[in-house]
Amino acid sequence: MYAVFQSGGKQHRVTEGETVRLEKLSNVTGEKINFNQVLMISDGETIKVGAPLINGGLVQAEVMAHGRADKIKIIKFRRRKHYRKQQGHRQWFTDVKIIGIIS
């Protein structure tokens, strides 16, 4: 059984027991949360597709950890103009473990 839900402006395909990395959520570690923006649910035989969301669809998860991703470097460069600019960024994330999928 798997589901596709929306969180942080992105869509995620998940199964029960899977750990997913999402955009930072404000929930506390260990807290259980529900995602109600479910776009699709499949149980192996039938597929339910929402238009755009499934009424009563729910993905239950538990917040495992918060953290920051690896640093990326942003470099601006203009040739022959003696212009170089370098900047770094580390994006915040939240790891959640999928507990259940309810259709």
From Swiss-Prot:
InterPro entries found in the cross-reference section: bL21-like, bL21-like_sf, Ribosomal_bL21, Ribosomal_bL21_CS
Taxonomy, superkingdom: Bacteria
GO MF terms, alphabetically ordered: rRNA binding; structural constituent of ribosome
GO biological process per UniProt: translation
Assigned keywords, A-Z: Ribonucleoprotein, Ribosomal protein, RNA-binding, rRNA-binding
Function: This protein binds to 23S rRNA in the presence of protein L20.
Name of the molecule in the record: Large ribosomal subunit protein bL21
